[in-house]
């Protein structure tokens, strides 16, 4: 079973809601999740930042579940903000989803725009899953 070691070296400033270093040992498999945005399954886009952040994290959970993984397996997230001033709201939302005692490594980036003009936020993730954990859902191509 892999071990995730969450480390914050004393020679680096204290992190705010993330971990500086996550060391994941094998045997395990790595899951890469493409950027998830605030679009619900029915195609509706959430109208404000908080709702988009929540929907993005719900979509992330669903994507991980399809790979037999969960948020507890996430070792790194990258967050894209159209307006970085929303980071405090994101932190509130994020802390409802991730273990605040051992959060994943994290990067926040302000960008000019996302793929659709209504989108305000996107999150992508890397997860390390123990071999044999969870059921992988395989979807047939149509």
Regions found by a protein language model. Give the residues of each.
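N-terminal presequence-like segments and the immediate start of the first folded domain
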Residues: 1-58, 62-75, 81-142
């Amino acid at each position: 079973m892999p071990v995730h070691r969450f480390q914050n070296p004393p020679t680096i400033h204290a992190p705010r809601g993330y971990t500086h270093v996550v060391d994941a040992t094998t045997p395990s498999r790595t899951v890469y999740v493409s950027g998830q945005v605030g679009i619900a399954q029915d195609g509706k886009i959430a109208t404000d930042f908080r709702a988009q952040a929540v929907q993005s994290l719900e979509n992330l959970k669903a994507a991980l579940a399809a790979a037999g993984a969960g948020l507890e397996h996430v070792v790194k997230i990258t967050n894209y903000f159209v307006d970085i001033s929303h980071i405090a709201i994101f932190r509130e939302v994020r802390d409802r989803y991730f273990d605040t005692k051992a959060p994943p490594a994290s990067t926040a980036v302000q960008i000019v725009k996302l793929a659709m003009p209504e989108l305000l936020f996107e999150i992508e993730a890397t997860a390390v899953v123990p071999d044999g954990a969870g059921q992988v859902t395989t979807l047939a191509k149509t």
